[in-house]
Design a protein with these regions (language model features):
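Soluble ligand-binding/transfer domains with enclosed cavities or grooves
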Residues: 24-266, 270-275, 279, 290
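Intrinsically disordered, low-structural-confidence terminal and linker regions
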Residues: 1-48, 300-303
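C-terminal or internal capping secondary-structure element at the end of a domain, subdomain, or sheet
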Residues: 279-285
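TerminUS-proximal long segments
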Residues: 289-303
Length: 303
């Protein structure tokens, strides 16, 4: 029964992509270029991608999601305003481990549970924690660069798994891209069967040294969430899901660590909040979570 429900749910998502998406040539929007996934994503997708594309996989504690935050610099963003600890996290992500707690809106919790239970687990991708203590044993954080022959970092892979369940929470590919009429954005690509979910996040540097990454816009071509489906070898359907927005607020804490509030909204309604405590330590493993309720009380409100 679970398999049947999952198949129906996946078919419905594809139907929405075909109904609401625009048909495009793959090369017509390079800022959306990204790999599409097989039926199961799992832990090795990025290595298979590297092998197929002739890319070198580089690992190490100094590997970061962005080789240099200055890649995001524009008239509206100055990376030199970022707090050193925030900048170091993005440029040397492999040095850090993460603890995470989740808080779902009661209104959207049943939908989230069904989507993760019937779809995410089948494809081994995007298994958001449904309960605050679901990641109490910690989560892995494996960062690897995919580099072409010229030495250019094409994508940075960031794989995060729940140490308790072994489920893949995220298997994402990170880069920068500039949508039409916008400055450089953080680009994240989450491969899914026959396509991907691409999120373009507009950066903001705040006076306190914190960083905001915002995925929201009004029309196709703005930062936001794009659901992409491969239809033919060189053709895709691209659905700009305007109602789905995200906000990341990354800020330094007084104890020297970094914290992140991640808000997901649907047409302005709160869906999910994730809070990350990011500390320097053994690469690839996060420490056991302690008292999430007390920790969550320290979360800043990010609107």
């Amino acid at each position: 029964m679970r398999r049947l429900i999952g198949t129906v749910a996946e078919a419905f998502i594809l139907f929405l992509c075909f109904l609401l998406g625009r048909r495009m040539d793959r090369g017509s929007a390079p800022w959306l270029d990204g790999p599409t996934g097989p039926r199961r994503i799992g832990t090795d997708f990025h290595r298979s991608l590297a092998a197929d594309a002739g890319l070198e996989v580089r690992t190490g504690r100094d590997v970061g999601l962005l080789p240099d935050c200055a890649q995001l610099d524009s008239d509206g963003f100055d990376s030199s305003r970022l707090h050193p600890s925030v900048r170091d996290f993005y440029e040397h992500t492999g040095r850090y481990h993460l603890d995470v707690w989740s808080q779902w809106s009661p209104l959207f919790w049943p939908f989230g549970w069904a989507l993760i239970h019937f779809v995410s687990r089948r494809m081994e991708q995007l298994n958001f924690p449904m309960y605050p203590l679901e990641t109490a044993q910690g989560m892995t954080s494996d960062v690897e660069q995919l580099v072409d022959r010229s030495g250019r970092v094409v994508f940075t892979s960031w794989l995060r798994r729940n140490l308790g369940s072994g489920l893949v929470i995220y298997s994402g590919l990170y880069a920068t891209a500039s949508p039409p009429g916008h400055g450089p954005c953080v680009k994240t690509v989450f491969p899914v069967p026959r396509g991907n979910a691409t999120v373009l996040l507009r950066p903001e540097a705040n006076a306190d040294g914190s960083l905001k990454l915002i995925s929201s816009g009004r029309r196709f071509g703005d930062p936001g969430f794009y659901r992409i489906t491969a239809t033919e070898p060189n053709r895709i359907r691209v659905w700009y899901v305007r109602g789905l927005t995200e906000l990341f607020h990354v800020y330094p804490d007084s104890d020297g660590s970094v914290r992140t509030d991640h808000h997901v909204r649907w047409w302005g309604l709160p869906v999910l909040r994730l809070h990350y405590h990011i500390t320097l330590g053994a690469a690839g493993r996060s420490a056991a979570a302690l008292e999430p309720p007390a920790d969550l009380r320290r979360v800043r409100r990010s609107q």
